Amino acid sequence: MMVNKEFEDYLLMRVHENDASRTKDAMAYSLMNGGKRVRPTLLFSVLEGYGMDARVGYPCACAIEMIHTYSLVHDDLPAMDNDDLRRGKPSCHKAYDEATAILAGDGLLTKAFEVALDSECSAEQKVALVKALSWYAGIDGMIYGQTLDL
């Protein structure tokens, strides 16, 4: 299954739950900035390979995409790579401002864990999912890679 409009709408809906704000707008701007959605596509393909409906993977795919996007928002900041463009469009800190970009990245990361917990799996599996996401996005995973990049 390729990522479709239904999944894109799901991503936006999860960002804008409860209310709208400048930070949520920056989160949505970054999340919907034209990525290829490779990670969700891989997850959906695996689910379909096991004969499952890809939609059961929406919460996990959304969480993974939010974590990936948070890393890009923070990577573009002046203190990191100081990139003005991301995928041919102004980086979040250029489209909004640096403080909003930091909050948007933080918001995407924390929202990812909330969304992941909406997965249709057992409590034990949810704990394993959150543990894996936090490790791979954490100091020994993605943050370690960013540290090497500085």
Stretch-by-stretch model annotation:
Residues 12, 16-150:
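Mg2+-dependent prenyl diphosphate-binding active-site environment of isoprenoid biosynthetic enzymes
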